[in-house]
Amino acid sequence: NTGAAVWKIEHRHRYTDQSPQGFGFDQGYVGLIEPPFSNEGTRLTNLYWRQRLNDGKATIVAGMLDVTDFVDVYALASPWTGFMNFAFSTGSAAMFIPNDATFGIGGGGMLTDRIFLIGSIANAYTDPTEPFDTVDDFFDENEYFTSIELGLTRGHDRIYLDNAHLTLWHVDKSNRAGTPGGWGAAFNYSRALRDNALMPFIRGGYANDGGSLLEKSLSIGFGYNTFGGRDQLGVAANWGEPNEDSFGSGLDDQYTFEVFYRFQLTEQLAITPDIQYLVDPALNPDEDNLWVFGLRARLAL
């Protein structure tokens, strides 16, 4: 049983008129492309205490959190190493996600050798560039994001690779932020095959209001590790129905396709070219489809 302080400070800035995070909406697409690649400047991502219990089979975190670290997680969700489109990440774009550095508490553990449970409560509305305001807001505003997740895995050490789960979430209404309350559900089934080389997945979500991007979403795809796990190919497709409470009624359904290949050039440096094909961008009736080309570099020292 061990404890640790976890923290992360970042500086995020654009080099052009539009940051990658805004590429989608800039072209009328309801969705986010590389959400971390924004223009927020210096900001706090997390600052919390992590306590592991029961020989590492249970964990509690408390402080300023990034809830995507433990809500609706699967192995290809990270925007740093996996898919770039948010439709293939937490909640399949059909979930309200608090901003980073939100004050709260989360915990999870193995109920049996195969069944796990994860829950959290956090401040729903926060600004990571003014992170310490979230502590007062948690106690004064009473506007919360809550989640509970029940899942099945082949073992505690396989929880990120072999994972079937159902996540339920709720967000409170905020008069100050001008956002509606709501609730929803997300599910995931992913399985690592062929000595962990191949991982197919199916994921989806439903939102009843809550200010999410999509109201209904379904994603399928796979990751394939090559050269003994050094490199990785990712292929995925998504169908999404924009949230009419967020964007209005009568919008077209969107279809998203993405392919990436991550080259691990050295132990520290990875380069990932990426192609996305966006069909029927809901907020741009003049365009039937859009192409997005990306190149991501990651240096881990």
Predicted regions and their residues:
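Surface-exposed coil loops of outer-membrane beta-barrel proteins
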Residues: 18-48, 55-149, 244
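Transmembrane beta-strands of outer-membrane beta-barrel pores
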Residues: 9-15, 64-69, 121-125, 168-174, ...
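Outer-membrane beta-barrel "beta-signal"
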Residues: 289-301
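Membrane-embedded beta-strand positions in outer-membrane beta-barrel channels/transporters
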Residues: 46-48, 104, 147-149, 186-188, ...
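Repeated loop/turn-to-beta-strand initiation elements of outer-membrane beta-barrel proteins
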Residues: 3, 56-60, 114-119, 157-164, ...
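Residue-level signature of outer-membrane beta-barrel architecture
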Residues: 1, 51-53, 64, 109-111, ...
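Detector for outer-membrane/organellar transmembrane beta-barrel domains
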Residues: 153-245, 259
